């Protein structure tokens, strides 16, 4: 086999990216008014990477998160997971098996304990724990992100904002998703708690191989991610490697409106 043939063969058998957005645009219609919030977005999201999305209000960040999370479909273009268009895969299946979104409002079941919230997520999605019972798996997950058994068995209404955020993360992880998305996850948290949440996101990407995508206005949070995506006027205008020295990064990544 020649080197050219080998290269072609390797390219043909290469695994598709985890998630690809191809020429994605999204338009909202209200009466006679149509507003396009995303315009021709092309990007690939990979496993083991922590992404942040910065941009002014109205730039399309939350819309992008909704499309990546399978909560909506683009007006034009395609969103594909592991080489399959999400509409072909099925949005409900994608959300149940592959992607989970943590919203600004955690949407926890407030009449349940932290532990019950996590086990309920597994029951709803039909997730099977890798070992032991769902309860045991939920306790392990909660412990892995800093919530001990005593905290796990408390009603979520009695937990702090940071603890509730951790429960929301554990609930998403309980279904062993490939992609974890979060919308302004540290906006209402104190600095120490916020940094603890960022530590969890980094661990999920770097130690567990998850793809983590976080919409934020925080430049400090973005500086700890692997890749910073900047949306302006509906276009993905910058892709910044945060491992580069700050002085080498393009301008416009402060995250201010």
Predicted feature locations:
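Conserved ABC transporter NBD signature motif
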Residues: 77-85
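ABC ATPase NBD coupling module
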Residues: 32, 85-100
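Short coil-to-helix segment of the ABC ATPase nucleotide-binding domain corresponding to the Q-loop/switch region
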Residues: 112-121
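Conserved ABC ATPase signature
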Residues: 155-159, 163-165
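Conserved ABC ATPase "signature" region
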Residues: 131-150
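Conserved catalytic motifs of ABC-family nucleotide-binding domains
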Residues: 176
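Helix-to-loop junction immediately C-terminal to a conserved catalytic motif
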Residues: 69
């Amino acid at each position: 086999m020649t080197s050219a043939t080998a290269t072609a063969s390797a390219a043909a058998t290469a695994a598709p990216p985890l998630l690809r957005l191809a020429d994605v645009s999204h338009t909202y219609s209200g009466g006679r008014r149509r507003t396009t919030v995303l315009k021709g977005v092309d990007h690939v999201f990979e496993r083991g990477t922590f992404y942040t999305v910065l941009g002014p209000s109205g730039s399309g960040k939350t819309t992008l998160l909704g499309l990546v999370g399978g909560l909506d479909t683009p007006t034009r273009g395609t969103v594909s997971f592991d080489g399959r268009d999400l509409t072909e895969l099925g949005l409900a299946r994608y959300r149940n098996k592959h992607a989970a979104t943590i919203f600004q409002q955690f949407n926890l079941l407030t009449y349940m304990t932290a532990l019950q919230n996590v086990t309920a997520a597994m029951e709803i999605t039909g997730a099977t724990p890798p070992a032991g019972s769902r309860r045991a798996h939920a306790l392990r997950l909660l412990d892995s992100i800093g919530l001990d058994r005593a905290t796990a068995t408390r009603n979520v209404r009695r937990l702090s904002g940071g603890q509730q955020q951790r429960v929301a993360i554990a609930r998403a992880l309980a279904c062993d998703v490939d992609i974890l998305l979060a919308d302004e996850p540290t906006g209402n948290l104190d600095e120490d708690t916020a940094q603890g949440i960022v530590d969890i996101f980094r661990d999920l990407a770097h130690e567990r191989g998850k793809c983590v995508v976080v919409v934020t206005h925080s430049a400090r949070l973005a500086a700890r991610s692997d890749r910073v995506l900047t949306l302006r006027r509906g276009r993905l205008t910058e892709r910044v490697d945060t491992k580069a020295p700050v002085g080498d990064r393009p301008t416009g990544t402060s995250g201010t409106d």
